[in-house]
């Protein structure tokens, strides 16, 4: 089986690197080819990496609470760049303050994200979802 490629990074002005490294390690050990663009990454960084590596999925992390602002328009930019249909996952502390999670999840799905994860989601949960949406056993 050919490995599926995932672009992983921390979006916006967020410099939280530890969780990013944990996800990189977990996704790699699960059999994915991980292209980790690191922290302080723009939407364009994710898109360019996905184009260059022919990625199957983009996984966006955000821990500083501004993910909703940073992620707005990503699906449209992916489509415009020729990445129509690429899977988009987002997770972490993606909004400011305590908000009703189903509302947060709905807003991100309306922005075009395929999966939306709250703080504390295990890498195993994300891996299972990646395998499901990418058709990996």
UniProtKB/Swiss-Prot annotation:
Matching Pfam families: B12-binding
CDD domains: Glm_B12_BD
Superkingdom in the source lineage: Bacteria
Residues that, per the record, bind adenosylcob(III)alamin: 13-17, 61-63, 93-97
Keywords: Cobalamin, Cobalt, Isomerase, Metal-binding
Enzyme nomenclature, EC number: 5.4.99.1
Cofactor(s), by name: adenosylcob(III)alamin
BP term (GO), one: glutamate catabolic process via L-citramalate
Domain B12-binding: 3-137
Molecular functions per Gene Ontology: cobalamin binding; metal ion binding; methylaspartate mutase activity
Pathway: Amino-acid degradation; L-glutamate degradation via mesaconate pathway; acetate and pyruvate from L-glutamate: step 1/4
Top EC group: isomerase
Matching InterPro entries: Cobalamin-bd, Cobalamin-bd_sf, GlmS
Recorded catalytic activity of this chain's protein: (2S,3S)-3-methyl-L-aspartate = L-glutamate
Function recorded in the entry: Catalyzes the carbon skeleton rearrangement of L-glutamate to L-threo-3-methylaspartate ((2S,3S)-3-methylaspartate).
Family, per entry: Belongs to the methylaspartate mutase GlmS subunit family.
Quaternary structure, from the entry: Heterotetramer composed of 2 epsilon subunits (GlmE) and 2 sigma subunits (GlmS). GlmE exists as a homodimer and GlmS as a monomer.
Identification of the protein by name: Glutamate mutase sigma subunit
Species of provenance: Clostridium tetanomorphum
Underlying gene: glmS
